[in-house]
Amino acid sequence: MKLLAVRRLFRIQRVVIRYRLDDLLFALPLPWFLLAVRYVLPWRWFPRKQLELSRGARLRLALQDLGPIFIKFGQILSTRRDLLPEDIADELMLLQDRVPPFDSQQSMKLIEEQLGKKISEVFSRFDVDPLASASVAQVHAAQLKTGEEVVVKVIRPGLKPIIGQDLAWLFILARAAERFSADARLLHPVDVVADYEKTIYDELDLLREAANASQLKRNFEGSPLLYVPQVYWDWCRPKVLVMERIYGVQVTDLATLADQRTDMKMLAERGVEIFFTQVFRDSFFHADMHPGNIFVSTVNPWSPQYIAIDCGIVGSLTPEDQDYLARNLFAFFKRDYRRVAQLHIDSGWVPAETKLNEFEAAIRTVCEPIFEKPLKDISFGQVLMRLFQTARRFNMEVQPQLVLLQKTLLNIEGLGRQLYPDLDLWNTAQPFLERWMRERMSPKTVLGNLHSQMEQLPHLANMTRDLLERMSQPHAKDPAPPWKKRKDDWFLRLLGAAHLVGGVMLAIGGPLNQLGHWPAGIMVAVGVYLIVRR
């Protein structure tokens, strides 16, 4: 093992001892042979200083001591309220990703290496002192030679080896927890670390962030709701991002917003509208909408516009997920818990063999108390969190896109009620969802979907043969995973479309019309059944 990795291990051990995290570990229901280990740990042989801190505070302080990679892991973990006890999740939300800036000469050297030009050849002004600094990157203000005011985001040098070492230790801890603790297995710690690994490496690629920002800007081009700064692609590289500099009021600066007479009710409602527009219209949403990434334009405070930055983390939903999510929300607010349970099974989010009655009862037990509150006080994010927590007890598959969505909704909801405490999220969102559902079922949309499915008709014979071969295999008894179930559903709808079109063509005339209309009727009926079946 490399010396650096060994030193890192000793550092982790010292922090564990300092904040008595071993006490938290041995409080878990571990096997006897692991619990026996506490008697051979030298630092447990002597009295230790008592810490007048909650377990969540001790964990938070330990992560802060371990540095930026562990801090960011704790921040991401804090969004998994479906996995964590509430007291720990609340403490982890307090983690601040603030670290001292790295040397500006290093920053300028890296920019020149990435751009292949001297700073003075690209920028007429470059501020050596950074505007902001975080664990992954820091930002400098500058002006392009062409006159545009910009910000230059630069990845910290030497991050990858540090991230690799810290991730290796996180995976070791996660695998040990999964192996030796039944409670830990329910939390899927290895999956959580794997999600973090993908997120942190994605954040190291600034071209990905630039592409996300360009997509979001295009989706809201000309919109009064949201403005996204311009990306200057000529000067973007994997470790350098150049964007338009924006000037606005941070969304949590309530005093300044009040001074400029901002319509706070409209601002809060527009935040909700932006969220649902991203999720249901665009299926592409900014998944890191914490207050540090959101500003409010100083123009037209009576019709306020949001400004979003830092598009490193985004999410998207499939059309099936969009549909099931909307139906779940409607069913929940109607207290139709059987429908909620059935939708979870139909979507493949929980296993097909789940007992519907038991699942319905569990959802009712957890969610019914929520309706003791007035409708305007009900939290959408809490609704989703409770549903996911309940579904996890029934072996719900981890859905990364839904976890991102729940995190984003909690952020938007908390922010909206901070701006306007009487915000009624359901009444604000309901018209949008109802309009989206109507548009989804409109003849124009149905015909558009039918047209896209018809494009697959040339492949129908091969797909039919493949499906029959799969069904004839002895191992075909194994339950299909959710993604495969959706593909098979899509194939059956395509087959239904082919029957429907074939039946119509047969009915209006063709080489077989001497047989009468009954074959056409059968084909149309089969087609309709296959298309609308659940």
From Swiss-Prot:
Q: Which domain of life is it from?
A: Bacteria
**Task performed by this protein:** Is probably a protein kinase regulator of UbiI activity which is involved in aerobic coenzyme Q (ubiquinone) biosynthesis.
GO BP annotations of the record are: regulation of ubiquinone biosynthetic process; ubiquinone biosynthetic process
Which HAMAP family does the entry mention?
Answer: UbiB (MF_00414)
Q: Predominant location of this chain?
A: membrane
Task: Enumerate the residues binding ATP.
Answer: L131, A132, S133, A134, S135, V136, A137, Q138, V139, K153
In terms of PANTHER family, this protein maps to: CHAPERONE-ACTIVITY OF BC1 COMPLEX CABC1 -RELATED, PROTEIN ACTIVITY OF BC1 COMPLEX KINASE 7, CHLOROPLASTIC
As for membrane topology, the entry says: Multi-pass membrane protein
Q: What is its EC number?
A: 2.7.-.-
Q: Which family does it belong to?
A: Belongs to the ABC1 family. UbiB subfamily.
What InterPro entries is this protein classified in?
ABC1_dom, Kinase-like_dom_sf, UbiB, UbiB_bact, UbiB_kinase
Q: Where in the cell is it found?
A: Cell inner membrane
Pathway where this protein functions: Cofactor biosynthesis; ubiquinone biosynthesis [regulation]
The UniProt entry, under NCBIfam families, shows: PRK04750.1 (NF003404), UbiB (TIGR01982)
Q: Tell me where in this chain the Protein kinase domain is found.
A: 125-492
Q: Which sites are catalytic?
A: D288
Q: Which CDD domains match?
A: UbiB (cd13972)
Upper lineage: Bacteria, Pseudomonadati, Pseudomonadota, Gammaproteobacteria, Pseudomonadales
Regions crossing the membrane: 23-43, 490-510, 512-532
Q: What name does UniProt use for this protein? A: Probable protein kinase UbiB
Its GO CC terms are: plasma membrane
Keywords on record? ATP-binding, Cell inner membrane, Cell membrane, Kinase, Membrane, Nucleotide-binding, Transferase, Transmembrane, Transmembrane helix, Ubiquinone biosynthesis
Which gene produces this protein? ubiB
- Can you name one GO molecular function term for this protein? ATP binding
